[in-house]
From Swiss-Prot:
InterPro entries noted in UniProt: NHR-like_dom_sf, Nucl_hrmn_rcpt_lig-bd, Nuclear_hormone_rcpt_NR1, Nuclear_hrmn_rcpt, ThyrH_rcpt, Znf_hrmn_rcpt, Znf_NHR/GATA
Residues binding Zn(2+) 2, per UniProt: 99, 105, 115, 118
One cellular component term from this protein's GO annotations in UniProt: RNA polymerase II transcription regulator complex
Organism: Aquarana catesbeiana
DNA-binding region per Swiss-Prot/TrEMBL record: 61-135
Protein name as catalogued: Thyroid hormone receptor alpha
Family membership: Belongs to the nuclear hormone receptor family. NR1 subfamily.
Lineage, top ranks: Eukaryota, Metazoa, Chordata, Craniata, Vertebrata
SUPFAM superfamilies, alphabetized: Glucocorticoid receptor-like (DNA-binding domain) (SSF57716), Nuclear receptor ligand-binding domain (SSF48508)
Keywords: DNA-binding, Metal-binding, Nucleus, Receptor, Transcription, Transcription regulation, Zinc, Zinc-finger
Amino acid sequence: MDQNLSGLDCLSEPDEKRWPDGKRKRKNSQCMGKSGMSGDSSVSLLSAGYIPSYLTKDEPCVVCSDKATGYHYRCITCEGCKGFFRRTIQKNLHPSYSCKYDGCCIIDKITRNQCQLCRFKKCIAVGMAMDLVLDDSKRVAKRKLIEENRERRRKEEMIKTLQQRPEPSSEEWELIRIVTEAHRSTNAQGSHWKQRRKFLPEDIGQNPMASMPDSDKVDLEAFSEFTKIITPAITRVVDFAKKLPMFSELPCEDQIILLKGCCMEIMSLRAAVRYDPDSETLTLSGEMAVKREQLKNGGLGVVSDAIFDLGRSLSAFNLDDTEVALLQAVLLMSSDRTGLICTDKIEKCQETYLLAFEHYINHRKHNIPHFWPKLLMKVTDLRMIGACHASRFLHMKVECPTELFPPLFLEVFEDQEV
């Protein structure tokens, strides 16, 4: 490959020679960068009145004295002479050029198209470099190299930006430690859930009537199985919240409102991060593995689809315990729940968690582009799941006998706004 290709985004090299006929040296090293104008893109720039910074106003072409547009093949020339010189070399036309007047033509803006030989000779005389005109293969190779260099610089800038993003302070690390421990101590089966889960028998929750598109019946056998694990699942969410220092400082009334508002969201998150693509199941409360239709027919309806879809999308995020814990803390401290007293204090608490969360994400350095905003979108998804479940709960109350509802289940979800 031509050594002139290496590492350049421009189309020519600097030249320190003086111009013939008393022309001065190029003004500065900016000429290298600006010579990228030699491509077709220069036409659109010129039509917009673009003038390179190294040219003086109305600076003439050193070949024909027309208005120069830039530094082309080591000389300041107009677009016409640049194109003429390039075509001549690329198509090897100069051996066929001839002159009717013994090679003595004066080349200017008016006469430049009348004698190709004298125009080409003047191009050479003023210093235009034949070796800088690339053939097709070299031009393709150069364009490829330019793109590779741009991509390399883009990645370097991205890495530099990531390295400059703040990581958790010592106070934030302590908060992160407390939140993570609160999650681990209240998350059933921990990292061993796959080994300890039990699959709900396939004949449960597969009621043909409940599965019919036009039917919204609840499979009572499946619903009964789910209610067996709902009380300990809710209790673990309450225990998680109580372990967070900022939560315990809130009035009791606000604590209750926050817990009722986030309970389904946190339980859904804990189930979603235990989505198993191989068996296409979610593991509820760390122990019961269920399929989509079983959860749907067991009372959740379309909410089941939302939780399974969330689980499938979250599997690409590869969240660790700390990220799941901080997501739960953000969901818990939602200041827009109806009836709260200390909304400002709760909002500041959530901001504290969010900032520590963002800094922790910076520390983790995930490979997914825009990881942080994409993860925050999952908070919105979980809030939607909570809202849909509040509506779905009313349907369950109609379809299912009251005696099947555990007291804590009723206490948490019965008075929620729809």
